[in-house]
């Protein structure tokens, strides 16, 4: 149950309704989400490794339950998410997927631990435009996921597909 009273239901779900207290800001949040999900050039598994890592950190019920629309075509299933949850020990994730999860974890918990050695590993696997993409994705995942967790927005009855 959300920790703030929700406006009249919009039909879009509580993950949207809570933000409708400030419609202009809600529109901006929606546009940012659309830009991130629609504009990323990261592979789906890389994006999902970063997104799910931050969802675990944020304890965002909505984010933890959200799945990718094209998941089956990219072998993104419950087993994949279990591997992401244990990315350090996973032998099933690619180097880029593990790095995306590690980047997301450091981004969310200790961005100052992103030292030159870590950036060298990142730049050995990703081009600079991909690192900019990953950074913007993680910013959106962290900010919006944390906001929904703070407000206490529950996962919807019907899973969100992105």
What are the roles of these predicted feature ranges?
Residues 128-162:
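Preference for long, well-ordered alpha-helical segments
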Residues 11-18, 43-59, 89, 125, ...:
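Alpha-helical scaffold segments that form or flank carboxylate-/histidine-based iron centers
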Residues 49-54, 84, 88, 100-108, ...:
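Short alpha-helical scaffolding segments that buttress acidic/His motifs in well-ordered protein cores
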Residues 51-81:
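Conserved alpha-helical segments that form or flank metal/cofactor-binding pockets of metalloenzymes
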Residues 1-48, 68-72:
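Mobile cap/lid helix-loop segments that border enzyme active or cofactor-binding sites
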Residues 96-136:
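Acidic/histidine-rich alpha-helical segments that form the ligand environment
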Residues 13-21, 86-92, 102-106:
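A ubiquitous short alpha-helical element
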């Amino acid at each position: 149950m959300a920790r703030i009273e929700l406006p009249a239901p919009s039909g879009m779900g509580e993950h949207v309704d809570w933000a409708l207290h400030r419609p202009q800001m809600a529109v901006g949040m929606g546009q940012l989400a659309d830009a991130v999900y629609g504009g990323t050039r990261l592979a789906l598994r890389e994006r999902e490794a970063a997104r799910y890592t931050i969802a675990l950190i944020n304890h965002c019920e909505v984010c933890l339950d959200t799945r990718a629309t094209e998941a089956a075509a990219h072998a993104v299933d419950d087993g994949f998410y279990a591997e992401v949850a244990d990315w350090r020990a996973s032998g099933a994730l690619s180097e880029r997927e593990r790095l995306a999860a590690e980047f997301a974890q450091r981004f969310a918990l200790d961005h100052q631990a992103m030292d030159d050695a870590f950036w060298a590993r990142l730049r050995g696997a990703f081009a600079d435009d991909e690192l900019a993409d990953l950074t913007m994705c993680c910013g959106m995942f962290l900010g919006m996921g944390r906001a929904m967790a703070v407000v206490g927005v529950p996962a919807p009855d019907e899973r969100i597909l992105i």
